[in-house]
Amino acid sequence: MDTVFALGSAQGRAGVSVIRLSGPAAWAVAETICGSLPDPRKSAVRVLRAQDGSVIDQALVLAFKAPHSFTGEDVVEFHVHGSIAVVRTVLDALSDQDVARLAEAGEFTRRALENGKLDLSQVEGLADLIDAETEAQRRQAVRVLTGALGEKVEVWRSKLIRAAALIEATIDFADEDVPVDVTPEVTSLLEDVSSDVRTEVAGTHVAERIRSGFEIALVGAPNAGKSTLLNKLAGRDAAITSEIAGTTRDVIEVRMDLGGLPVTFLDTAGLRQSADEIETIGIERAIKRAQEADLRVFLSGPDERLLIEPLEDDIRLTPKVDLAPGSQTGISGKTGQGIPELLEKIRSVFSERVSAVGLATHERHRLAMQRALEDLDNSFEALLRGPEFYDITAQELRSAIRALETLVGRIDAENLLDEIFSSFCLGK
């Protein structure tokens, strides 16, 4: 295994930058520029020197001995002053060592996976934590990073292995008198796992939305005040406003952190019958995007006909209430009236949905669990048909186990790993 190094903190000027080495020669390489290393898992200040003996910087140095490190290998970290010049010079000094090379994107984390320090779901949790912008995203990523999904998968896997073992034992002793009927226990195990997996699958949509952001479509007729409201919510001129109906033709998006929840407001084209071909295309897009959104806010009077059928949680508000003297209900993008109440209602709706979120956070997780459910359904069907179909039951159970194992990376999937790690920076 090569020894690799990279900048482990953000690129650019900073108070402190972290440079990480990992691999069998990490300690030897580090000693060439800092002299003696501190004891494992302890820190010490060292002077870093180039090959010609010139001083590069003073650094805080930490050393970790395998397997007690992030990667499971020997690791050394240099915490240097965050000057671009200092970082570049340290990296150049490390490059001068023939036994070390610059790490590829995500290579440190990949080594942690290969050495059993993380499972695949934890790797994805780490990536999500790095990308987290809101509190809900951070909490969700931490749950996965700390191994909660992997622990749940292991419980499912253990139960299915027990069920498969019972079936296999019955097959092996088919010609002998087996005193115990395994069907009740196997049935109970399959029902337990199937129920848990279905619950987890049901929560994946919300989990994926926490990662990408809940979408809220502003829907209404032309000149209903949608763009003005969007600009008020954004605190800037995100959309063009005009007294001319049909100004908005493309869907305009504004992302926000709403009480820790990631949301995206969509300003859609005004809905009406139009002879303008370009506007008609915009209206068709608006209807499609609004129907796909997680929530719709209809800006329309109580007697107006809606071109999109509202769903249970959708919100309907009278727009431009600033033009109706004495009105206490509705909303105004111009004055801000009704906006706090709207945001609280939206936050309440999504908070209730988030309460049902599971641990599976990626589409890959959902697809793997759906495959496992199909295999479990097939195995249960074969089980009920009697002992002569136990070989099919065992085969389907093994398929279900393999599907669940892909969640945590027990099954080799080189292309999948390449895709996941390509999203990491060099220092991870």
UniProtKB/Swiss-Prot annotation:
Q: SUPFAM superfamilies under this entry?
A: Folate-binding domain, P-loop containing nucleoside triphosphate hydrolases, TrmE connector domain
Q: Which GO terms describe its biological process?
A: tRNA methylation; tRNA wobble uridine modification
Q: Which InterPro entries match?
A: G_TrmE, GTP-bd, GTP-bd_TrmE_N, GTPase_MnmE, MnmE_dom2, MnmE_helical, P-loop_NTPase, Small_GTP-bd
Keyword terms of this UniProt record? Cytoplasm, GTP-binding, Hydrolase, Magnesium, Metal-binding, Nucleotide-binding, Potassium, tRNA processing
Q: Where's it mainly located?
A: cytoplasm
Q: Which PROSITE patterns match?
A: G_TRME (PS51709)
Per the record, its GO cellular-component terms are: cytoplasm
Could you say which protein family the record assigns here? Belongs to the TRAFAC class TrmE-Era-EngA-EngB-Septin-like GTPase superfamily. TrmE GTPase family.
Q: Per its database record, what is this protein's job? A: Exhibits a very high intrinsic GTPase hydrolysis rate. Involved in the addition of a carboxymethylaminomethyl (cmnm) group at the wobble position (U34) of certain tRNAs, forming tRNA-cmnm(5)s(2)U34.
What is the protein's quaternary organization? Homodimer. Heterotetramer of two MnmE and two MnmG subunits.
Protein name per UniProt: tRNA modification GTPase MnmE
Taxonomy of the source species: Bacteria, Pseudomonadati, Pseudomonadota, Alphaproteobacteria, Rhodobacterales
Q: Which gene encodes it?
A: mnmE
